[in-house]
Design a protein with these regions (language model features):
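Enzymes that bind and transform nitrogen-containing heteroaromatic metabolites
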Residues: 2-239
Length: 239
């Protein structure tokens, strides 16, 4: 029996299936940055500091392991790698019923929503296929693109998670980022599993997820799995 089937069988007879709160495929540099400085429409992941070996290309060098896989959702031509990296890319939508993201992940605007034509980075068919809750202090009405509905909420992590779990209808909730949002949910101790892909680059400045991943080991088990692509997959799950 697979782990998935065991979980499904255990849920039979329970009033409510356990819903996990998950971070998946979250990319950081070796020095712990998930985005560079100065994020904008032209540079969604910001810019890296200049290093002796040159300047990292963002997001290319940070997330190239995912772009290169056969299961990358934006792939327009046949091909791509299989193996460990592809497994994580392919696993991204499994049992996810809702996502929570920060406003910075949704788009580059700050303050009041002046440009309502902006509907995210993802075009007419976003890759989420679930309700998405965008954390913001400014009101904006919900809207749908294909099978994804974006809701804009001014809420602390606990309340945002309550709404997302209700919308997920028994499935898991993904904390999608950006960096500040993942940090907030870690600080609130609301995350059950965390997958971070550490790229073999340094960014030097910007938004930092951690100074050291070892700071999480009082709360999480850790398995570190290197990939032939050069990234190291860090898999955390609650103690």
């Amino acid at each position: 029996m697979t782990a998935r089937n065991e979980r499904d069988d255990e849920s039979e007879g329970n009033d409510e299936m356990t819903q996990l709160v998950r971070v998946q495929n979250f990319c950081v540099s070796m020095d712990g940055f998930g985005a560079g400085e100065g994020q904008s429409l032209e540079a969604p992941f910001g810019r890296a500091a200049r290093r002796a070996g040159g300047v990292a290309s963002l997001p290319g060098d940070l997330a190239s392991w995912g772009f290169a896989t056969a299961s990358w959702p934006n792939r327009t031509e046949p091909g791509g790698s299989y193996g460990l990296d592809d497994y994580f890319t392919r696993d991204f939508p499994r049992n996810i019923g809702a996502e929570i993201m920060g406003r910075n992940k949704f788009g580059p605007q700050r303050g009041q929503w002046e440009n309502l034509d902006w509907q995210g980075w993802w075009g007419d068919t976003p890759p989420f296929h679930t309700p998405v809750f965008v954390l913001t202090h400014y009101h904006r009405s919900s809207f749908s693109l294909a099978d994804t509905t974006f809701h804009f909420i001014d809420a602390k992590p606990e309340e945002a998670l309550r709404q997302a779990k209700e919308a997920a209808e028994g499935k898991d909730v993904r904390i999608g980022g950006g960096v500040a949002t993942v940090r907030k949910f870690l600080e609130a101790d609301l995350i059950d599993t965390l997958h971070v892909a550490v790229a073999p680059i340094e960014i030097g400045r910007g938004e930092r997820l951690w100074t050291s991943h070892e700071d999480l080991l009082d709360r999480f088990h850790l398995e570190s799995v290197p990939s032939p692509s050069g990234v190291t997959h860090l898999l955390f799950w609650r103690r």
